Amino acid sequence: MQKRAIYPGTFDPITNGHLDIVTRATQMFDHVILAIAASPGKKPMFTLEERVALAQKATAHLGNVEVVGFSDLMANFARDRQANILIRGLRAVADFEYEMQLAHMNRHLMPQLESVFLMPSKEWSFISSSLVKEVARHQGDVTHFLPDNVHQALMDKLK
């Protein structure tokens, strides 16, 4: 039986920290679904379609990654995709508290859904999409933190 995992997030935009997690996940699981949440409440800078396209290009070199948008409850999405592993990145203790709540709720909704927590490589442990956007808005150089296609798209958005 194939091990199918979901790595969900808003990915507004996808960063090299996210790519670090998804790349490592591809070595652990047969199929990884990079699930990009619509997240209208967060008022994303990029549309869902843009975020999916950016992530598809950024992960094109990874043969076992599928990038899809979703707006459903995570447990329902996982059930529909026949995945029982949820990948989550943890940068700090503050992330853990929130992620633990989500993991427990997801297990309540879908008992066979297991959460797997991965810490990003040290190089990416402090970055987030929000931080990268904020630095870029103030003309800071964020080239190192984003895939090339994403960096270009962010610069275009900020013009």
Curated annotation (Swiss-Prot):
Q: Which GO terms describe its biological process?
A: coenzyme A biosynthetic process
Specify the pathway: Cofactor biosynthesis; coenzyme A biosynthesis; CoA from (R)-pantothenate: step 4/5
Iron keyword on record: no
Does the keyword section mention ATP-binding? Answer: yes
Q: EC number(s) in its UniProt entry?
A: 2.7.7.3
| Required co-factors | Mg(2+)
Where in or outside the cell?
Cytoplasm
Key words of the record:
ATP-binding, Coenzyme A biosynthesis, Cytoplasm, Magnesium, Nucleotide-binding, Nucleotidyltransferase, Transferase
Which residues are noted in the entry as substrate-binding? Answer: 10, 42, 74, 88
What Pfam family is a match, any one?
Answer: CTP_transf_like
Q: Which GO terms describe its cellular component?
A: cytoplasm
Q: Which leading EC class covers this enzyme? A: transferase
Residues reported in the UniProt entry to bind ATP: 10-11, 18, 89-91, 99, 124-130
The UniProt transmembrane annotation reads none
Annotated site (Transition state stabilizer), which positions? 18
Q: Which GO terms describe its molecular function?
A: ATP binding; pantetheine-phosphate adenylyltransferase activity
Q: Where does the source fall among the domains of life?
A: Bacteria
The catalytic activity, as recorded, is: (R)-4'-phosphopantetheine + ATP + H(+) = 3'-dephospho-CoA + diphosphate
Cross-referenced HAMAP family, in alphabetical order?
Answer: PPAT_bact
Q: Which NCBIfam families does the record associate with it? A: coaD_prev_kdtB, cyt_tran_rel
Query: Of which family is this protein a member?
Result: Belongs to the bacterial CoaD family.
Spell out the subunit comment: Homohexamer.
What is the stated purpose of this protein?
A: Reversibly transfers an adenylyl group from ATP to 4'-phosphopantetheine, yielding dephospho-CoA (dPCoA) and pyrophosphate.
Q: Which PANTHER family does the UniProt record give?
A: PHOSPHOPANTETHEINE ADENYLYLTRANSFERASE (PTHR21342:SF1)
Protein known as: Phosphopantetheine adenylyltransferase
Whichever gene encodes this chain, its name is coaD
